[in-house]
C-alpha cells in the first residue's frame, strides 16, 4: 500500500492503459493448490475467462492490481481464486478483506468464495449492514480467513477491533466505481488508514472515473494495470432491441403485449426508481401476471427471500432498481427489459450483462421514448454496439423473438 500523490492528469479518465499482457489460458497452468483447483472445476469452470487469464497470476504473485472489466466477465472468481491461493487455512483470522457496494453483491461473493474453497477448510463471513451486529461480532471472533462486506459495516468492525487486521495479506475493492459513487469514499479512505502498510491492494472497476483513479494513486504501489477492452467483453451474445414508445404511459401496454409473444426462461425488468418498481408490480399483478419486486427500501430478510425464489426459478420475472444490477447472478436470466433506460451509460452493461453471463445467449429490450433517444445513442457509441428496432409483423404485433438458451 502506498501513500503518494503523483500527477493524476497523466491518466485519461474513463479507461486505464494496460501495462501487462501475459495470458495463462488454462487453470492447470496457474500452479494452484490441488484442493483449490478441484474447487475451481467443481464450481463448473472449464477454462479461464479473459480477465482470469490475465489477472489471477499477478495477484497471486503479490502485485497490486487494477483490473478494469465489466460485470459478467468472471471478476468475482478472479479475485476469489487468487485470494484462496494465498491464504493459509491453518491460520485463523482475516487474511483477505473484500469490499463490495451492495449487500447482495457481498453475499454473492461470499457464496463464490465458499463454493470454490469447498475443499480447503476455510471460513468466509459476510459482514453487511441490515444484519445483527452481535452476530457479526461473534462470527468475526471465530477468525474467518476471508471477510467480505459493505464499507460501513466493515469500517465499524475494524474500529471496534473485532475485525483484526494483523494477519491481513490482501484488500480487494470490487465495483470500486459504484462504491465511490454511492458515497462510501470516506469509509474506504478510513479503512485504508486502518490496514497494515504491507497489505496488497486489488481494485476492480468497470469504469475509471477520477475518484477511482485517486484511490489507485494514493493507496497502490506500482500497480499492474489490466484492461479487458469493451470490445472484448461487452455485449457479445446479447441481442439488443429497442421499442419506440410514444408516451411513458404506453409502456405498460407494450410490456403486456411483449409478455404474450415472448417465451421467457427468466427475466429481469429494470426501472429507475423504487416507486416505479412498486407501481409496475401492482399494475402487472392486477393484470394477472406473476412478478416479484426488489429494491433498496426492503428489509434485508425480504430481499433474501425474493432472491432465493428467483434463483430457484419459482418466480420467473423480477422487477428491480439498479441496486440489483450489481449483485445478481442467475444462470437462467435470458431476457432483460429496461422499462426505463438507465440514468447513466455505465449501468447499461451491469443491467444487460445479467442476460448473457459467461458467454450465454440473452436478449435485452429497451423501451425508448422520444426523450430517451439521445441516451440510447450515447450507449451505442460508448459500447460500440447497435441496438436494433424490435421486429414487428404486419398486424403490429411483435414478432416471436427466440429467447432460448441453446
UniProtKB/Swiss-Prot annotation:
PANTHER family (UniProt xref): ATP-DEPENDENT RNA HELICASE DBP3
Annotated function: ATP-dependent RNA helicase which is a subunit of the eIF4F complex involved in cap recognition and is required for mRNA binding to ribosome. In the current model of translation initiation, eIF4A unwinds RNA secondary structures in the 5'-UTR of mRNAs which is necessary to allow efficient binding of the small ribosomal subunit, and subsequent scanning for the initiator codon.
Motif (Q motif): 25-53
Positions contributing to ATP binding: 69-76
Record's GO cellular component terms: cytoplasmic stress granule
Keywords: ATP-binding, Cytoplasm, Helicase, Hydrolase, Initiation factor, Nucleotide-binding, Protein biosynthesis, RNA-binding
Biological processes annotated in GO: cytoplasmic translational initiation
Domain notes: The Q motif is unique to and characteristic of the DEAD box family of RNA helicases and controls ATP binding and hydrolysis.
Motif (DEAD box): 174-177
Record InterPro entries: DEAD/DEAH_box_helicase_dom, EIF4A_DEADc, Helicase_ATP-bd, Helicase_C-like, P-loop_NTPase, RNA-helicase_DEAD-box_CS, RNA_helicase_DEAD_Q_motif
Primary gene name: tif1
Domain annotation Helicase ATP-binding: ranges: 56-226
MF term (GO), any: ATP hydrolysis activity
Record field: catalytic activity: ATP + H2O = ADP + phosphate + H(+)
Enzyme class: hydrolase
Keyword Ligase: no
Superkingdom of origin organism: Eukaryota
Organism: Aspergillus fumigatus (strain ATCC MYA-4609 / CBS 101355 / FGSC A1100 / Af293)
Descriptive protein name: ATP-dependent RNA helicase eIF4A
Signal sequence coordinates: none
Amino acid at each position: 500500500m502506498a501513500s503518494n500523490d503523483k500527477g493524476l492528469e497523466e491518466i485519461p479518465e474513463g479507461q486505464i492503459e494496460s501495462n501487462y499482457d501475459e495470458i495463462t489460458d488454462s487453470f492447470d497452468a496457474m500452479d494452484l493448490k490441488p484442493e483449490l483447483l478441484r474447487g475451481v472445476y467443481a464450481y463448473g469452470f472449464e477454462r479461464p475467462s479473459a480477465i482470469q487469464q490475465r489477472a489471477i497470476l499477478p495477484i497471486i504473485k503479490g502485485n497490486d492490481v487494477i483490473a478494469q472489466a465489466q460485470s459478467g466477465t468472471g471478476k468475482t472468481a478472479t479475485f476469489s481464486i487468487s485470494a484462496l491461493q494465498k491464504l493459509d487455512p491453518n491460520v485463523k483470522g482475516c487474511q483477505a478483506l473484500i469490499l463490495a457496494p451492495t449487500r447482495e453483491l457481498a453475499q454473492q461473493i461470499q457464496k463464490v468464495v465458499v463454493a470454490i474453497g469447498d475443499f480447503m477448510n476455510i471460513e468466509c463471513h459476510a459482514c453487511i449492514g441490515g444484519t445483527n451486529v452481535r452476530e457479526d461480532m461473534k462470527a468475526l471472533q471465530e477468525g474467518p480467513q476471508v471477510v467480505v462486506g459493505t464499507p460501513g459495516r466493515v469500517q465499524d468492525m475494524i474500529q471496534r477491533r473485532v475485525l483484526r487486521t494483523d494477519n491481513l495479506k490482501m484488500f480487494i475493492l470490487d465495483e470500486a466505481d459504484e462504491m465511490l459513487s454511492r458515497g462510501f469514499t470516506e469509509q474506504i479512505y478510513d479503512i485504508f488508514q486502518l490496514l497494515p502498510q504491507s497489505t496488497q491492494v486489488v481494485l476492480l472497476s468497470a469504469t475509471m472515473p477520477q475518484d477511482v483513479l485517486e484511490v489507485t494513486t494514493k493507496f497502490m504501489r506500482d500497480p499492474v494495470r489490466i484492461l479487458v477492452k469493451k470490445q472484448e467483453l461487452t455485449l457479445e451474445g446479447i441481442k439488443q432491441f429497442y421499442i419506440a414508445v410514444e408516451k411513458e404511459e404506453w409502456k405498460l401496454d407494450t410490456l403486456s403485449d411483449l409478455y404474450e409473444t415472448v417465451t421467457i426462461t427468466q427475466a429481469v425488468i429494470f426501472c429507475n426508481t423504487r416507486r416505479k418498481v412498486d407501481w409496475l408490480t401492482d399494475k402487472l399483478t392486477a393484470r394477472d401476471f406473476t412478478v416479484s419486486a426488489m429494491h433498496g427500501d426492503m428489509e434485508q430478510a425480504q430481499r433474501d427471500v425474493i432472491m432465493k425464489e428467483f434463483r430457484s426459478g419459482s418466480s420467473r420475472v423480477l422487477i428491480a432498481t439498479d441496486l440489483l444490477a450489481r449483485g445478481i447472478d442467475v444462470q437462467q436470466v435470458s431476457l432483460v427489459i429496461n422499462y426505463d433506460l438507465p440514468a447513466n451509460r455505465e449501468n447499461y452493461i451491469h443491467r444487460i450483462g445479467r442476460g448473457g453471463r459467461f458467454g450465454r445467449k440473452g436478449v435485452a429490450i429497451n423501451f425508448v421514448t422520444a426523450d430517451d433517444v439521445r441516451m440510447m445513442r450515447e450507449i451505442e457509441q460508448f459500447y460500440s454496439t447497435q441496438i436494433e428496432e424490435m421486429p414487428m409483423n404486419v398486424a403490429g404485433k411483435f414478432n416471436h423473438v427466440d429467447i432460448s438458451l441453446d
